[in-house]
Amino acid sequence: MKKLVLAWVFACGVALAQPAEGTVFYEVFLRSFGDSDGDGVGDLRGTTERLDYLQDLGVGGVWLMPLHRSPSYHGYDVTDYRSVNPDYGTMADFEAFARAAHERGMDVVIDLVVNHTSSAHPWFRQAEAGNAPRRAFYSFSDTDPGWQGLGGPAWHPSGRGYYLGLFWSEMPDLNYRNPAVLREMQDVARFWLARGVDGFRVDAVQHILESEGGIIANTPENIAWVGDFERFIKSVKPDAYLVGETWTDTETIVRYHRAGLDYSFNYPLFTALVGSVQDRNPGELERVLEQDLALYPPNARQATFTSNHDQIRPGTSLGFLRRDEARLKLAAGLLLTLPGTPFLYYGEELGLPNGPGDADEEKRTPMMWDGSANFGFTTGTPWYAFSSDDSTLTVAAQAEDPDSVLNWYKTLIALRNEYPALREGGLELLPGTPDTVLGFRREHEGQRLIVLANFAGEVQVDTAAYAGATELLTGRAVGETLTLGEMGMGVLELKPE
C-alpha cells in the first residue's frame, strides 16, 4: 500500500516568527468558557481564571474568537475594532488576560475580521447616509452586478443602489481598493499589538479583494494583500504573525505561503484526518500527507486541527450513535504527532459533543468544568444550553480518570512538548505496514521517533527493524512485533545511531 518515502521539513533556513515550531494552541469562545460575574455569559476575567488549566494541559498559545463590540453573539460583525465587547469586560480586563497568559508562556492570538464590518458599524451607517468618504469604505453600485455570494446574492439593496456583502446583508464588505481602508485596518492591528497581542487569526482571508468580474475568492490581488499585511505587522512587531482561515484546496493555500503568509489552517488535512478515522482506513489521510509533502514550501507553517467553531465537534462526528473514545483518541493522537502547529477547540480535549440542533450555537456551547450547578461555568443562567448533561464529561471527572480523553490529550501534549522531533521534525511516510496502519518517522537533530497508528481492529506490526526501541506511551521495550489494539497507537523512540 505504501510506495512512497518522503521527507517533510516545515522550516529550514528561513527566519520565522514566534511562537516555537509545533506549539499547541487552544481556541476559546469567551462567551462559553468561564463566567466570572454570574451573568451567564463567559468573559475575560473568567477565562483568565482558567489559564492555570490551560497551562496544566500544556498549551503554548490561546486564540480568542472575536472580542470586539458586535450586535451578534458570535462577534464576527464588528461595530468597533478598538473596543472590548462589554459582555466580556473592559480593555483593562483584556490587558490583564494578556499579561497573565504571557506570564505562563502563552502567546495571545485574537480574531481580526478584516473582510467586513457590521451593518451597524458607524462607518456603514454614515456611508448609507451619503457621507462620501465613508461610502468609499464599502463597495456600492447603482445597479445589481448579480454576483453570487456565500449562500445567497452578494449585492444587497440600499436606497437607490446596492452594496457588496458576501456573507449576508448585515456584513457589508470593506473596500480595500481604497487606501484609507487599508490604513485604518493597519492602525487597528497596531492598536492591538501594543496591547499584548502576538498574532491575528484572519477571518475570511480568501475574500478580502474580489475581482471586478465577480470572482470572490483567492484572487491574485487578495493573495498579495495577505502577504503585504503580514509584512506590515512584522514592521510593527517583528515576531508578530498571521494565521489565515485558508478554507480552500492545498494548491491555493500554497500560493498564500509563497506570498508571505506565516500560518495557514490546513483544511484538506482536517477533512482527511477526521474522515479516515470515521472510515477506519488511513488511505485518504496518507494521500493528503503525500500531497502536502510534495507541494508545501519549506517556510510554510501549517495550523492543524480536528475541530473549530465552524465544524461538527469530533465528540459528535466520530460517534453519531454513541460516544466513541477510541476514535476520539486516535484523532487526537494523529493531530499531536503529525507535523504542524495544532489548534485545539475548547472542550475538544474532553470529547464534548455538539448540542442537539443544527444551529452554529450548538458547536459553541458552554464549557463543562465540574459536577456543580451549571457544570461550574456560571452561577447564573447560562447564555445557552450545555451540549450534554453527563457529568462524567467534565474536566473534574476526567482529571480523576487515568484513561480519560482529557488525560490522553495531556499525555500527547506533554510528549510533544518534550520531544523536538514531534514539534520540529520532518515527516517520512513508512512503507510496508499493514493496510490498516499508518506509519511515519519524525526526526530532528538525531532524535528519531516512529509513530504507528491503527485505524481498525487489533493488529500486529513487524517491528524487527526497531527492536530495542522504547514505546513511549507505555515505557516498554519494543521486540520483533508490536501489537496495536483497535484504534491504538504506538510511539517508538529509536536508539541513537
Give the location of each predicted region.
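C-terminal beta-strand-rich structural cap/linker in extracellular carbohydrate-active enzymes
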Residues: 480-497
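Solvent-exposed beta-hairpin/edge-strand motifs
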Residues: 465-475
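Surface-exposed beta-strand/loop patches in extracellular or lumenal glycoproteins
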Residues: 455-467
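Loop/helix patches that line or flank the sugar-binding groove of alpha-linked glycan CAZymes
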Residues: 19-21, 233-236, 248, 255-258, ...
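Acidic/aromatic-lined carbohydrate-recognition and catalytic surfaces
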Residues: 18-186, 190, 194, 205-258, ...
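Positively charged n-region of N-terminal signal peptides that target proteins for export
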Residues: 1-4
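Core domains of carbohydrate- and sulfate-ester-processing enzymes
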Residues: 125-165, 272, 277-295, 364-388
